[in-house]
Curated annotation (Swiss-Prot):
InterPro entries: Ald_DH/histidinol_DH, Ald_DH_C, Ald_DH_N, Aldehyde_DH_dom, G-glutamylP_reductase_CS, Glu-5-SA_DH, GPR_dom. It comes from Neisseria meningitidis serogroup C / serotype 2a (strain ATCC 700532 / DSM 15464 / FAM18). Transmembrane segments: none annotated. Its main location: cytoplasm. Its EC number is 1.2.1.41. Belongs to the gamma-glutamyl phosphate reductase family. It holds the Pfam family Aldedh. Keywords: Amino-acid biosynthesis, Cytoplasm, NADP, Oxidoreductase, Proline biosynthesis. GO terms for molecular function: glutamate-5-semialdehyde dehydrogenase activity; NADP binding. Catalyzes the NADPH-dependent reduction of L-glutamate 5-phosphate into L-glutamate 5-semialdehyde and phosphate. The product spontaneously undergoes cyclization to form 1-pyrroline-5-carboxylate. This is Gamma-glutamyl phosphate reductase.
Length: 420
């Protein structure tokens, strides 16, 4: 048995301590984990510095931001755990009840998933978010961090386990796979005897590898090739605010806009204003400018590189924005259907017909009208922290909170009935 299999077996053996814990016990564990995380801040920051030093010069600046921890972010992680503790416990919720003509009483009840596996990349905060959500939803959790964030993840898990050890929940219910090589991931993908669910969080390559190779049931958290379409009937000042926020507030995350579609009737007015805000004003403020990848029509109005064949199919996760002009809302929808990833897409318009057409025809987990796509987030949706953004339709779609991490079973109460 490999080390990874041993860790999977430990999690499976410990799951009963979580599955059978009541709400008070789970909340007590989460609060202890949050306190322990803050108490271990110095150790976590030291480990994070090791990760940052190892990654220096190897990853883009925007990705470094995802990897970076500081005291404020550790406090935010701890507060995120406390926020999960404050959420209603979904386990045990009665979803449906019915009584059959023969007198059988059927109850559909929400139950824990069992053991959840998470494979993720360079975001240390996923470690605490995933642990909190899994444990509150009644499941043990097995984490596999990317190499870039491994030292940070190890220090975070050590702190969380210290907190768990003060409660009745077995600390073995939280595991961090030590094998950061490819084989560690593939062992998790094949661990059908140990894992009830596997969730990948990361770039397109990771997600594709998990979806194509896993025998464990998977919820796909797709990449975010996020579009915003600025319609001819848009309020341009509103559009400017939305586009700036969607692209520059945090470009390294999956709900950040990657493609801007602009109606050709307003391109000559709108695009130069946007260029001034996203390029010249940012340079003057000492901030990274947005670099445009332009189709030929957009290039008539602003400066930038000519868009390549793949630019409208790329999740940049950087200060790069692909820009295309379109002749109608129908053309915008057609482009998104051809190039989108069903994550988050939005329209800016004051035309109700255009908005209704867009929301009806765009098949994404979150569709926005006159708002930034950056709101696709468990916390913003009132779910607490999230396990990821599901872009599939089965079991879960959009931000995955506690309910999305549970299953259900039927309890059938009889008085001696037999089937004829």
């Amino acid at each position: 048995m490999s080390n990874t299999q041993k860790q999977l077996a430990l999690a499976k053996a410990a799951k009963k301590s979580v599955n059978t814990a009541d709400t008070e016990e789970k909340n007590r564990a989460l609060l202890a984990m949050a306190d322990s995380l803050e108490a271990a801040a110095a150790d976590i920051l030291a480990a994070n510095r090791q990760d940052l030093e190892a990654a220096a010069g190897k990853i883009p600046e925007s990705m470094t931001d995802r990897l970076l921890l500081d005291g404020k972010r550790i406090c935010a992680m701890a507060d995120g755990i406390r926020a999960v503790a404050a959420l209603p416990d979904p386990v045990g919720e009665i979803l449906e009840t019915s009584t059959l003509p023969n007198g059988l009483e059927i109850v559909k009840k929400r139950v824990a998933m069992g053991v959840i596996g998470i494979i993720y990349e360079s975001r240390p905060n996923v470690t605490s978010d995933a642990a909190a959500l899994a444990l509150k939803s009644g499941s043990a959790v097995v984490l596999r961090s990317g190499k870039d964030a491994f030292q940070s993840a190890r220090a975070i898990v050590a702190a969380l386990k210290t907190g768990l050890a003060q409660t009745r929940i077995d600390p073995d219910a939280l595991q961090l796979i030590e094998d950061t090589g490819r084989e560690g991931s593939y062992e998790m993908m094949r661990a059908k005897d140990y894992l009830d669910l596997l969730i990948p969080r990361g770039g397109a390559g990771l997600i594709r590898a998990v979806v194509e190779n896993a025998v464990v049931p998977v919820i796909e958290t797709g990449t975010g090739i996020v579009h915003i379409y600025v319609d001819k009937d848009a309020d341009l000042e509103k559009a400017i605010r939305i586009v700036r926020n969607a692209k520059t507030s945090r470009p390294s995350v999956c709900n950040s806009m990657e493609v801007l579609l602009v109606h050709e009737d307003i391109a000559a007015d709108f695009l130069p204003k946007l260029e001034r805000l996203l390029v010249r004003d940012r340079i003057e403020a000492g901030l990274p400018p947005v670099r445009f990848r332009l189709d030929p029509q957009a290039a008539r109005h602003i400066g930038g590189e000519a868009a390549g064949a793949d630019d409208f199919d790329t999740e940049f996760l950087d200060y790069i924005l692909a820009v295309k002009t379109v002749a109608s809302v129908e053309e915008a929808v057609g482009h998104i259907e051809a190039h989108g990833t069903h994550h988050s897409d939005g329209i800016v318009t004051e035309n109700r017909h255009a908005a209704d057409y867009f929301t009806t025809h765009i098949d994404s987990a979150a569709v926005y009208v006159n708002a930034s796509t950056r709101f696709t987030d468990g916390g913003e949706f009132g779910l607490g922290c999230e396990m990821g953004i599901s872009t599939q339709k089965l079991h879960a779609r959009g931000p995955m909170g506690l309910k999305e991490l549970t299953s259900y079973k039927y309890i059938v109460q009889g008085t001696g009935q037999v089937r004829e």
